[in-house]
């Protein structure tokens, strides 16, 4: 049986596991059960020498300012140029941002746009992960808004993979769907308010739709409540608990272990995500104390540009988009 020394912050949160006969002056525990000292987390194992093994406690990395940005794009060439500028314009240290880029089974040039962005700006970030492998030939044949259980399962898998990647490195997590456009202050605001473990910036649309449900029905989908419109029109301002946050949100790294997008119910993956959190008594919050961007559904880039120059003209300066976009 091994002897275990439990590291602290000064030792970079590592466990050293020694052979039974090794004499140590430090406090020792005689057990194989590392989870006894740090529950719910996996351990990164490295062999050192002379039978000594090192385990890094990834779960203890709670104090970090590094963030994974999940860019999950399929058939999004119409909005990716504007979206990627919004991501690039975040006023947060890029060396502390890690891009997780996943695209699959496209019928347009989304992959090419993403690769061009990586080629131009990738080295400015802390790291970049890119994967364009196919997940399901069936997905490629489906219409853009053909929502069905198979598609929910694939999208849930994609989202879960990005969560696991952030969890592996102990980073915070931020995702914005590719038709969700966030202003440069967004990630900074999320980090400033990270005491709210799951937090979404309110993103309005031209209609009454937004990236949250104030309450839900028995199946976890939207249900009417007067406070929905009060939040949307900022009659209630600040960070408020809601029953669903979706599309764009921040997750504190110590909450990633509780995230799941698949519960076997074959529902929308965002419904499962929120339902799992509610069952674990983890509150989701919406923050609307500032303008953080907007949400659109355009399938044509020219239509998007027209919409930005017309309906959203008042908001464009907030995004600091380069003049050559139009």
Q: Across the structure, where does each feature detected by a protein language model lie?
A:
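Active-site-proximal specificity loops/subdomain of glycosyltransferases
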Residues: 117-169
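Cell-envelope/extracellular polymer assembly enzymes that use nucleotide-activated donors
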Residues: 66-68, 98, 272
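A structural helix-start
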Residues: 73-81, 103, 107
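C-terminal catalytic/acceptor-binding lobe
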Residues: 2-30, 34, 236-249, 253-326
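Short beta-strand-to-loop acidic/aromatic patch adjacent to the donor-nucleotide binding site
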Residues: 170-181
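A conserved acidic beta->alpha catalytic loop
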Residues: 102-119, 132-136, 180
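Short, acidic, metal-binding catalytic loop of nucleotide-sugar glycosyltransferases
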Residues: 85-96
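Conserved catalytic core of nucleotide-sugar-dependent glycosyltransferases
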Residues: 163, 183-262
């Amino acid at each position: 049986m091994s002897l275990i020394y439990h590291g602290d912050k000064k030792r970079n949160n590592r466990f050293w596991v020694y052979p039974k006969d090794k004499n140590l002056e430090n406090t020792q525990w005689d057990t194989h059960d590392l989870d006894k000292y740090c529950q719910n987390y996996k351990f990164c194992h490295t062999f050192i020498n002379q039978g000594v093994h090192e385990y890094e406690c990834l779960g203890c990395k709670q104090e970090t300012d590094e963030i994974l940005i999940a860019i999950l794009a399929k058939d999004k060439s119409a909005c990716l140029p504007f979206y990627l500028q919004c991501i690039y314009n975040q006023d947060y240290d890029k060396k502390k941002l890690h891009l997780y880029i996943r695209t699959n089974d496209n019928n347009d040039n989304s992959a090419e746009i993403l690769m061009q962005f990586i080629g131009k700006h990738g080295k400015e970030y802390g790291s970049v992960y890119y994967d364009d492998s196919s997940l399901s030939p069936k997905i490629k044949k489906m219409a853009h808004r053909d929502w069905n259980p198979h598609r929910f399962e694939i999208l849930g898998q994609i989202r879960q993979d990005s969560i696991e990647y952030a969890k592996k490195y102990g980073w915070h997590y931020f995702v914005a769907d590719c038709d969700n456009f966030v202003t440069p202050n967004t990630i900074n605001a999320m980090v400033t308010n990270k005491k709210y473990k799951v937090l979404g910036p309110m993103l309005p649309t031209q209609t009454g739709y937004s990236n949250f449900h104030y309450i839900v029905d028995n199946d976890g989908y939207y249900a009417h409540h007067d406070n929905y419109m009060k939040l949307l029109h900022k009659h209630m301002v600040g960070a408020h608990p809601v029953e669903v946050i979706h599309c764009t949100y921040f997750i504190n790294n110590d909450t990633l272990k509780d995230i799941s997008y698949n519960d076997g119910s074959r529902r929308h993956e965002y419904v499962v995500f929120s339902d799992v959190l509610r069952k674990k008594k983890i509150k989701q919050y919406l923050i609307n104390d500032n303008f953080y961007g907007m949400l659109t559904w355009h399938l044509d880039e020219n239509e998007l540009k027209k919409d930005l120059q017309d309906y959203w003209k008042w908001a464009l300066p907030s995004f600091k988009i380069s003049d050559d976009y139009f």
